[in-house]
């Protein structure tokens, strides 16, 4: 057997290879171990979103009576582009495969259907139970450290049938999960043998339903499954904002034959639902996990005492270690309970419920009495309607829907009552509102640890500059000795520490911190680009020019890096982080002035102006990044050159490349990115001339790159004779272009 494709368990083969090998195998009377040819069934590829199972079945009806058409979809019900057609009677599959079938003007890919097989357990040589030796004594403390890979020992679980170790490709580690397909098969096999796999238990009288789209609600799905028995509950799984994840569960009151329901075919809104048994995934109990002892790192040497609590220092930064109130062991290092830590609503709900039953309260938050958390709120629901809906449980004191700074609902809120109510009873009930089930839970007020637990860092002021630099101490254009404003904490009289916030312009999209320093402090505005998405201020000051990271605001949308350096001006583009979405202005300083105009990339999307100062003046035109829709020119001066990328923010709305500024005049071509939709040219000045090429990015609509070369620094503020010379040269080139076009 080829080493490139050994017969390992769960190995798969491509459809093309399996088709050829299976055909050869069928002609010789034997079957390959990779898979078996399914009789009277044809593989169909090249299926797009316009094709449904009914149309495909009618298309193949010429070859025989079609038994079933199955289009393979993912978990959300989106077609994967292929499927299978099975026939009732015997048909000549090779004849069908050899024919050419066109559907919706597209040729389908045909082949025999092959059912892939897994090797039986009796053919696999099980490996004996081998336990790695313990680590040397000096590494005993990292034996259970989740952040240490050297001696991290996986939990070894023997196979319940063969008593051998499971395959290393899928070890049964704590908190392991299994996919629904795999769990369905394994659980069915387990149920037939009378034992349950540790990954999860089959939920009786409950069916998994996949392929649910936005048009389906719980009431309709419940009525659809009513033919099999009395439906107890229908639950569509949604995210925190109430948007469906595409699957859910249907539970029945009485005993039903789940296998019979799963084997049936249910079509809903013209779409086939995916059915399977419901499996409740399990995590290993806490008693099976060996807790690691309380180990505290030694304090730093005396010369590093001042950085012990410095949030910008990573060397000796010591996390606060909080023993678990139940086991008295340290929490996992992957989620330490640090000051100001927050917990999610689901985790806090479970932990708070357990805590309340034992008579103590977790430090993360306290349960708010007579208040209920309500999730799954959409834009159609208002506070009055929600209050009337909860009026059956008691006199409603207040309904509060949580919104962002712009007033848009975040999808959840709280309902508080005047009198004492049974919150657990309300949480256990099922409330449907506008045909949608609300998510309920106890309300938990998150807490921050008291200030006495935080070791403040002393007030440290940078030394003043030498005398020869005193004049540049407060010069906003000087980066050498630019001194940040130090604001003491009004309580502790120590310097406030500021942390990095996710999704800020000083970070990449993954949330990793992009260290920036030596800028002036910016004023704070609601919803500005220097704040996080919740509207909290991200104070940044004393920046130096910082490198560009993928997908940062100083790069193009395609993710290619656009290095920016030695600019006063940044490239402006629509929807950039230097604009807000609500229309609040973000003042930027030390630019040359230019007028503001509606709907330009120098403004917010609502049309409010973004005043920028100390730019060279240029005329303003409506609705164009570099010109208006009528073709009037928008001359731009005095930029340093930077590389242009496809789909760059310094391009027109067509997305073609606009290599910037100060070129010598060049001919205008229809549909070029240097023109507006009417074809008028956008003249640019003071670059060396370059020839025009067919199909280049600066001409036709194909978007091919037009290589540019021999950049020069543009002149600064051309005035007087110099300005007249520039316009004279531009006029010469324009006249030459007109002659060329007239000759053509």
Swiss-Prot record:
Q: Which InterPro entries match?
A: DAZ_dom, DAZ_RRM_vert, Nucleotide-bd_a/b_plait_sf, RBD_domain_sf, RRM_dom
| Ranges of compositional bias, category Low complexity | 11-27, 176-192, 341-357
**Highest taxon of the source?**
Eukaryota
The protein's matches in Gene3D superfamilies, at most eight in alphabetical order, are given as: 3.30.70.330
Ranges for the region named Disordered are 1-27, 163-192, 328-357
* PROSITE patterns, per the entry: DAZ, RRM
Record's GO cellular component, any one?
protein-containing complex
GO terms of biological process kind: 3'-UTR-mediated mRNA stabilization; cell differentiation; positive regulation of translational initiation; spermatogenesis
- The principal location of this protein is cytoplasm
Q: Which disease is it linked to?
A: Spermatogenic failure Y-linked 2: A disorder resulting in the absence (azoospermia) or reduction (oligozoospermia) of sperm in the semen, leading to male infertility.
Stated role: RNA-binding protein that plays an essential role in spermatogenesis. May act by binding to the 3'-UTR of mRNAs and regulating their translation. Promotes germ-cell progression to meiosis and formation of haploid germ cells.
Name the UniProt record assigns to this protein: Deleted in azoospermia protein 1
